[in-house]
Amino acid sequence: MSSNPRHDSMHEFRVEVVRLMLDGKAEVAFGLLSKHYGIREPALRVGTVKRHRKVLACYVEKERRIYLSNSSFLTNPFVLLHEFYHHLRASAVGKSRQVEKRADQFAEVFIRDFLSWRSAIVGRKR
């Protein structure tokens, strides 16, 4: 366990965000993320967008909306966090520079903290 309170609180925040997403509460998780980063919440919709019909999900900057191609992605933290990163970047920069690698890394940090938390919980139960 880290002795850095800031690290611990960020770790707990990330765990909570992923738990909410896994529980099907993506909008609540987006609310927490948006408040944390000081930006407006993105809208969320299941459906596809012209020219992006073959992707799992996409962020449409003009609408400030995340589209998921399938409702099963409503509980997929990696997809949700990846698309939220695009919303965060567009909100902060004001440009649609879609940086896939950084979006993946953003999502992976949350997932890694959640998996670390979950393995610690499972370890305590043994």
Question: In which residue ranges do the predicted regions lie?
Answer:
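Short pre-active-site segment immediately N-terminal to the catalytic Zn-binding motif
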Residues: 64-80, 93-98
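Post-HExxH zinc-binding segment in Zn-dependent metallohydrolases
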Residues: 96-126
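Auxiliary, metal-adjacent structural segments of Zn-dependent hydrolase domains
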Residues: 6-67, 71-73, 119-126
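Aromatic side chains
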Residues: 59, 84-85, 106, 110
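Metal-dependent phosphohydrolase cores
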Residues: 34-36, 79, 84, 115
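Hydrophobic (often cysteine-bearing) scaffold residues that line and stabilize catalytic clefts
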Residues: 26, 77, 99, 103
